[in-house]
Amino acid sequence: YYKVPFSLEGVELDGSGLPTGIFRRNANYVLRSNVLRSLPDEFRMEAIHLAMSRLLENGITTVAAIEGGWLFDDRDAEFIYAHSGEFPVDMPLFYQTMDLAKVWKLGLRRVGGNIMVDGTLSSHSAALSAPYADRPDYRGQIFLPQDGLDEFVQQCYRQDMQLALYSIGDRAIESVLLAHERAIRQ
């Protein structure tokens, strides 16, 4: 079942109010999660085995699995976690969640990937210090406020967890660096 309510933010409608089939923002996240949740584990394993043979053919012995979280679905992270010992390539799991207790309980020592501090340049949501050239009234958006980011990074440091954050714009990068500087001083 992939259906997304037409009233959900991000469902593009045509002039007569009917969906065009283009899903953005929340509608895209809901649709993607519905699709990913519906995939059987056999399909996941088959896809991983195909990727593994290609990786090994090219001499690649480690690949980071950046899985789960609100942009995708936790099912892939859970699958990688459950089957990690079965792969011929080392696949450290970066669980894309800010729920450190959940990650810690699984015995994982890394978190992140698409934990988004800001957005993308193409959507004008990357947080810039100067306005966008084609939108002089807008500088993008910080998704994680500094105090929340500081606390999250400090928790990762206290628990000795490796952390990967998504930051594109220079304001977001500055915010991440500041959070790391503050965590180091704690």
Residue ranges: model-predicted function:
Residues 104-105:
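Acidic/histidine-enriched ion/cofactor-binding microenvironments in catalytic or ligand-binding pockets
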Residues 109-125:
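Non-cysteine beta-strand/loop elements that form the S-adenosyl-L-methionine
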Residues 1-101, 121-172, 185-186:
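Divalent metal-binding segments
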